[in-house]
Swiss-Prot record:
GO terms for biological process: DNA-templated transcription. Keywords: DNA-directed RNA polymerase, Nucleotidyltransferase, Transcription, Transferase. One of its GO terms (cellular component) is DNA-directed RNA polymerase complex. It is an enzyme of class 2 (transferase). The lineage of its organism: Bacteria, Bacillati, Actinomycetota, Actinomycetes, Propionibacteriales. Belongs to the RNA polymerase subunit omega family. Its EC number is 2.7.7.6. This is DNA-directed RNA polymerase subunit omega. The keyword Nucleotidyltransferase applies. The RNAP catalytic core consists of 2 alpha, 1 beta, 1 beta' and 1 omega subunit. When a sigma factor is associated with the core the holoenzyme is formed, which can initiate transcription. GO terms for molecular function: DNA binding; DNA-directed RNA polymerase activity.
Length: 110
């Protein structure tokens, strides 16, 4: 009896092998997708409060679809990119932004 086969949704769709081509390692894929899933979850939580701090899903979603499944589909469709950040470079940018904010604040007080 061969009927239509139903593909499982979630972690197996999109396939892990396809997802691994989007990042350098499994570890990075896990961190990347988990962070995005938390953002999607926070977005849905904020909808009721009227706050929109986070960006909602970038793909069409289904009823009761889990945030991790949505995040994995976004990664697979190349709607998100993962870039490595040099901690020293990030600290220098933050220091420059704080210095610029301090300069702007001191010019208003004069």
């Amino acid at each position: 009896m061969s009927g239509p086969t139903i593909a499982a949704e979630g972690v197996t769709n999109p396939p892990i092998d396809e997802l691994l081509t989007k990042t350098d390692s499994k570890y990075k894929l896990v961190l990347y997708s988990a962070k995005r899933a938390r953002q999607i979850n926070a977005y849905y939580s904020q909808l009721g409060e009227g706050l929109l701090e986070y960006v909602g899903p970038l793909v069409d979603t289904h009823v009761q679809e889990k945030p991790l499944s949505i995040a994995l589909r976004e990664i697979n469709e190349d709607l998100l990119t993962c870039e490595d950040v040099d901690p020293a470079e990030l600290a220098a940018e933050e220091a420059a932004a704080q210095a610029a904010a301090a300069d702007a604040g001191s010019s208003f007080s004069e």
